[in-house]
Amino acid sequence: MQKTAPRPPSARISFLSASVLGLGAAVASRGAVFLVNIMLAHSLTVHDFGLFSYAYVTALNLGLFLATGVSQAAGHVLPLTEDPERRRRQLCAFIVLLVALIAVAATALYLSATSISIAAFGSAQGGEALRMAAIVLIATAFTQALQAFLYAMHEHRASASVSIGAALLLLAMLWTMGPIRQPVVALVIFLAINAGAAASQLVILGRTTQNQRGPWRTGRQELRLAFKHALPSVLTTSMGAPVHWICLSMLAAMTDGAHQLALFSVAFQWYIAITFIPATLGNLALPFLARNTGATEAMVRQRFRSALLFGGGLSLALGCMAFLLAGQIFAWLYPAAYGSAAASMRSLAVAAALCGISVLLQQRIAAAGKFWRNFAMAAVYSVIYVAAAYLALRLGYGAPSIGLAMSAAYCCLILFQTLTLQSDSGAAIRLGRSFS
């Protein structure tokens, strides 16, 4: 029986439709995890929640940075690969590279959990939580990257269906269980649902790229191309994980470090929720921008302007809302012990609004093939971030120091990105023609 050919280009949806689907999936998936964290904040003590949040944020940052790095390279290469068989082999190469990176990162985190805990807290009290974080890392990074691969293959509807279905299933299971007393229970449910979502995503990718030549396979040429594009991208995004961990460790080294981490972590969940939206739009925008083979510079500028106005404007609106409603949010949703976290949320709301703009600018530079330029600017951002966090902590700002440092670093990064785009206005056009 002859297999169905991949969907023709005429069935591809517009960027606006893809954005609506992607945002719906992002809101559903992040909202489900967000509610779980609120439930845990009510169930655990502030100290235990601080340890758990430290591990969770470590895993989430490292996992998402790895996934974003690989998916950014895939979103650049796959839309420009016209031959179906070559695209299939190239997609398989990116999946192999992703699995290898996740395995190395998760193993390193698991084996060094005790050492990291001693460096951060002065004791091994967070070692078990970090070992649990290594497992969470596998689930979050793999499903996030597969979702971006689906975007690059134009499967926006299927990707949104999987994300929304997994989120609804997670909420339904937790609702029937009642209050969560042990984080391990929530972890097991989370991993099981992520495994199902990843399996569904792989099935969809298989159907999208099916042909008459048997099972998936890749080769050295595809692996070299994947590594060539993913290396600077992964280095750029992964740089944020250790840098963020250094700043969290400086916060944990304070006299009431675990308490300060808890205050920061509950506010950081709102930062993740806001920045997840421009990150999703970035994963959507990059394939659309990279696909402009033979397009005019005006067309590329117009598509990028639409993405920037939509994603950047939404990030600014959400950041302003979080800044203004920080006090009410913590009064309504969290125990009284977390009331002082509103200050952290305000500083992180400013950082989140700036991050939304920076992410889209970064994707525009990546669409032009300037991956190493992004890496250089990320290195400068990291230095400013650590230096500003150290200074703010020394001045006694406590948990809000991290948000203040991120805001200062993002301001500098946006300035550098804007100057880069002005000097390389036609790079995307030249790059697109080289693939055609």
Curated annotation (Swiss-Prot):
Biological function: Probably involved in polymerization and/or export of exopolysaccharide EPS I which functions as a virulence factor. May play a role in export of EPS I or its intermediates across the membranes.
Tree of life domain: Bacteria
GO BP term (any one): polysaccharide transport
Membrane-spanning residues: 20-40, 49-69, 91-111, 132-152, 160-180, 184-204, 234-254, 261-281, 307-327, 341-361, 375-395, 396-416
UniProt protein name: EPS I polysaccharide export inner membrane protein EpsE
Subcellular location: Cell inner membrane
Provenance organism: Ralstonia nicotianae (strain ATCC BAA-1114 / GMI1000)
Gene Ontology CC terms: plasma membrane
Main location: membrane
Gene: epsE
